[in-house]
């Protein structure tokens, strides 16, 4: 069979994801010719891989004008409609799906043998008050009967370069099926969603809202947005694929991490460190930085902090000359294992950043301090610090092992302190400030700090890290524009760390605080829901009383 594939690619980072290369590797077995149309720039490395590794020599780069439909139009014009008419089928596809999850050859054979079908796709969209019934365009195949008809050329010849994607949806995505039906052709969808129950759906898009149905029906493609748009369901989708499909789910995780962020819910399950190990010897030097703002607190934890093995060197900074003298006396017995520095900066992280010349000689670095973590609550402040320091020390060797053994890991952060998990310490992330600093820093990736329900915070800034993972922070010119208030500065930096590492393609691991069962989270959630219901009930009661009084006054 002479099958042609017009494959449209777009990537805001001008990068071809691993799942796309895998997809093309599987698809090339089915097609006589693949034309790769990119609506974003391609690197020379990616072009070389397409040509040499996959044998795809037909590459068409264009601006993202008119989106997928204009790209397919340009692909047809570039190939020529006469060539299309002489082929047995033309498949239009984009890179918005993972797959193939299951065998695709048998599906082609089934539809090619069915004389009652002229064009077909994976899923259709039922008629609504807003849209006509239509095949979803992420995968559509036209047979020769359609390709030879003048209606096919007429439709594609009038496709415009719309600047608004909604115009593309309104004019082409939702209209092409009806256009070819009116021309006398017949279509089928591998999953005919018209026959499926959709009463509870806000929008009858099964590829997005019903991904479990997609897997149950063994459709070979799963939309990327089915995972990003259903963040707490995504983990179960991955588990189902690992059980029922041979598709390498690592490609999904890599794509989600690279393009959508390091802390999607479906990625968190793999971030806990393994059981704590002891006496791991790193091949490269390790440094623990401690910034001392309160000498009695430092004394309280001194024995624990300096109980680490001989591979650990220490850098202790302090901003007060009198406290420096106290530290010199307290640490004199440790000799050259400890470097003591009088810092010009009082904030713990600024004090560390000032020591760039020392830190860059170490592959792995830890950071903690004695600064106040919870304002005006001494008991809470002590409880949080205790949790954080205990994790930093207990998991020190395991953290260094993860940093050294896993090239992709750049940070190891503490789990949520008990105080946070109990709902007794909450603070809203400084989202506008984070977004502004990110923009000013001119980083590689874009990240939306405004939309996610939560952002990952490194409490206290306590962390083990690779210098290379946070090199951008040490070089960041916009540090001068950071808040002057120490608490505001902490809020910003603690919310930036995992995203700065992610921008440099580093992931993070979590030191578990396992003393709290997950049942506690469920109990807290139920308590919050109950509280919300009570507030709503009180609000409704107050409104009823006001309405009643208003009616009584009117009667007078």
Name the predicted role of every residue range.
Residues 1-556:
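ER/Golgi luminal nucleotide-sugar-dependent glycosyltransferases, focusing on the catalytic module
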């Amino acid at each position: 069979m002479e099958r042609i594939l017009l494959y449209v690619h777009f990537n805001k980072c001008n990068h071809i994801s691993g799942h796309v290369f895998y997809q093309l590797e599987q698809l090339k077995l089915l097609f006589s010719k693949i034309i790769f149309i990119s609506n974003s720039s391609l690197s020379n490395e990616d072009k070389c891989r397409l040509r040499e590794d996959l044998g795809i020599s037909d590459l068409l780069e264009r601006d993202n004008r008119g989106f997928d439909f204009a790209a397919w139009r340009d692909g047809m014009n570039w190939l020529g409609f006469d060539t299309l008419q002489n082929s047995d089928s033309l498949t239009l596809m984009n890179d918005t799906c993972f797959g193939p999850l299951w065998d695709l050859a048998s599906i082609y054979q089934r539809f090619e043998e069915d004389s009652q079908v002229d064009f077909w796709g994976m899923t259709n969209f039922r008629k609504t008050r807003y849209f006509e019934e239509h095949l979803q365009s992420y995968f559509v195949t036209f047979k020769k009967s359609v390709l030879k008809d003048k209606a096919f050329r007429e439709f594609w010849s009038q496709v415009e370069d719309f600047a608004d994607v909604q115009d593309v949806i309104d004019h082409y995505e939702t209209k092409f099926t009806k256009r070819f039906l009116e021309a006398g052709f017949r279509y089928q969808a591998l999953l005919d969603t018209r026959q499926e129950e959709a009463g509870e759906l806000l929008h009858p898009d099964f590829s997005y809202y019903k991904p479990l149905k997609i897997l149950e029906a063994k459709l070979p493609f799963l939309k990327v947005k089915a995972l990003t748009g259903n963040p707490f369901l995504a983990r179960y989708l991955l588990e189902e694929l690992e059980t029922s499909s041979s598709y390498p789910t690592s490609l999904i995780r890599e794509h989600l991490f690279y393009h959508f962020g390091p802390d999607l819910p479906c990625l968190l399950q793999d971030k806990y460190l393994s059981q704590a190990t002891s006496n791991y010897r790193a091949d490269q030097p390790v440094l623990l930085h401690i910034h001392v703002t309160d000498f009695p607190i430092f004394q309280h934890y001194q024995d624990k902090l300096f109980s680490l093995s001989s591979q650990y060197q220490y850098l202790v900074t302090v901003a007060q000359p009198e406290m420096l003298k106290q530290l010199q006396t307290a640490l004199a017995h440790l000799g050259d294992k400890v470097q003591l520095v009088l810092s010009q900066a009082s904030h713990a992280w600024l004090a560390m950043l000032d020591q760039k010349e020392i830190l860059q000689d170490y592959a792995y670095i830890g950071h903690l301090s004695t600064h106040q973590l919870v304002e005006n609550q001494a008991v809470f402040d002590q409880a949080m610090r205790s949790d954080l320091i205990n994790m930093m020390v207990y998991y020190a060797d395991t953290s260094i092992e993860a940093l050294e053994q896993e090239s992709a890991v750049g940070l190891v952060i503490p789990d949520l302190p008990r105080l946070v998990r109990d709902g007794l310490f909450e603070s809203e992330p400084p989202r506008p400030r984070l977004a502004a600093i990110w923009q000013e820093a001119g980083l590689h990736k874009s990240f939306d700090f405004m939309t996610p329900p939560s952002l990952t915070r490194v409490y206290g800034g306590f962390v083990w890290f690779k210098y290379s993972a946070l090199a951008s922070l040490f070089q960041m010119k916009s540090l001068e524009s950071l808040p002057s208030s120490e608490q505001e500065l902490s809020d910003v930096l603690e919310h930036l760390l995992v995203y700065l590492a992610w921008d440099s393609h580093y992931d993070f691991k979590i030191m578990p605080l396992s003393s709290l069962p997950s049942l506690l989270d469920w109990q807290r959630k139920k308590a919050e829901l109950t509280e919300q219901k009570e507030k709503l009930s009180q609000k409704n009661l107050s409104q009823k009383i006001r309405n009643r009084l208003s009616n009584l006054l009117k009667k007078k």
